[in-house]
């Protein structure tokens, strides 16, 4: 699994000109699911996301987590994060999981985050053409890959 976490002042996702979800201060998470991904990847990511300290404390130091600030999370599926660009200039999606694998993992990821946060997370709609708006805060952007845990 690959994610991009963006610290935001607010974010929203719109589908067919209708707002599906919106959040205030928190994280916009773009989620790409690969063919080899499992529930173990979800568990690792959720622990990292919940514990990640990228919000400022009283001294202006990034020392507070999403839980500490009582922030919100919006998760948007994005298979393009699994792009392979090894050959040529047109990306390939051979590493992206098929729908029958990725939809249950996407739903489980969102449920696990909600459970860890103790409140619902906002979501997009898997496979839909979505318009995502956000106001980056910082900007602070973190990329994580469960196959390359650095």
What are these regions (language model features)?
Residues 87-101:
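A charged helix-plus-loop insertion that forms the helical arch/lid used to bind
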Residues 1-89, 104-150:
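N-terminal, polar/charged subdomain of small-to-medium soluble alpha/beta proteins
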């Amino acid at each position: 699994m690959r994610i991009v976490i963006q610290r935001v002042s607010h974010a929203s996702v719109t589908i067919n000109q209708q707002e599906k979800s919106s959040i205030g201060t928190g994280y916009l998470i773009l989620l790409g699911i690969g063919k080899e991904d499992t529930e173990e990847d979800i568990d690792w990511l959720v622990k990292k996301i919940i514990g990640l300290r990228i919000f400022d404390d009283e001294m202006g130091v990034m020392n507070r987590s999403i839980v500490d600030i009582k922030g919100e999370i919006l998760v948007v599926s994005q298979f393009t994060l699994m792009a392979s660009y090894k050959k040529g200039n047109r990306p390939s999606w051979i590493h992206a999981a098929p729908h029958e694998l990725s939809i249950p993992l996407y739903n489980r990821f969102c449920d696990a985050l909600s459970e860890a946060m103790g409140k619902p997370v906002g979501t997009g709609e898997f496979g839909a053409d979505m318009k995502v708006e956000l106001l980056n805060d910082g900007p602070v952007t973190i990329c994580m890959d469960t196959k390359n845990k650095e």
